Amino acid sequence: MRKFLLRLVLAAGVPLMAANPGFGHREYRLTVMGEYSYNNTWGHHGNLDIQALMPFNPYFEMEAKAQLSTASVYNLALQFRPKFTMPVGELFIETDVYVRAIARNQMTDYTASLGLGYRMDYVSVNLGLFTRVMSDWQRSWYTDETFVVEPFNLLYRLEVFCRPQNNPWNLSFLFSNVDDYQMERMWQPLFGIGAYVDVADHWRINLSAQCKPTGMFHLDATFYGATFRAGFTYLF
């Protein structure tokens, strides 16, 4: 009887432990997105996003992103993500570096973050800290002017999926104060919805939308801006 129970446990447990967890990235990916955006500061504008995901091995991946905007705002982002497979899901450490050149205001925004995250088939959560340094292009190195520094801000991200993350199509809902190119103060969350569908062996169509209120956690949830994206991903 004991041998039978042991065989039963092994038969059920080994496939579960060896199964694809359903969310890991195993292919190099190139994503190109067109974007329409409006906010109360920059008005109507369009963006072009180019993103490259590079999973060097099962334990480490890197992502590089660039965005050009008709609002004369230019973004670069790098993400480094060590990953650790757990009995259920995946634990990861994420380091992000963002650079935003705001040509219209002649200033540059540098942001860096460190976060700890966990993801499973239907949910991904990330919590961490980030710091921001802002510099004016007219700043002189020979004066007493200093950078504007925000030393510590809370970073949070919660994304819920309707299907396992390795499914040929999916729909997700996002609550966060960080997206691909910006990190907002903790009281300025972003609400988003995203979808993708695999249309061929190497091709994926992406759609997403985001809305950002103004200072929601200060009880002022008036509309600030919205973004709509559409594009494709090529999986190598």
Predicted feature descriptions by range:
Residues 1-29, 236:
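Cleavable N-terminal export/targeting peptides
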Residues 19-71, 233:
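Short glycine/proline- and aromatic-enriched beta-strand/turn motifs that initiate or cap beta-hairpins
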Residues 28-30, 56-64, 86-94, 122-127, ...:
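Repeated loop/turn-to-beta-strand initiation elements of outer-membrane beta-barrel proteins
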Residues 34-40, 66-72, 84, 97-103, ...:
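Transmembrane beta-strands of outer-membrane beta-barrel pores
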Residues 34-36, 50-54, 78-84, 112-120, ...:
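Residues on the lipid-exposed face of transmembrane beta-strands in outer-membrane beta-barrel proteins
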Residues 42-48, 72-78, 106-112, 121, ...:
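Residues that define the transmembrane beta-barrel architecture of outer-membrane proteins
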Residues 64-68, 99-107, 136-149, 181-184, ...:
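Flexible, solvent-exposed loop segments that connect beta-strands
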Residues 177, 182-236:
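Predominantly the C-terminal beta-signal and adjacent terminal strand-loop region
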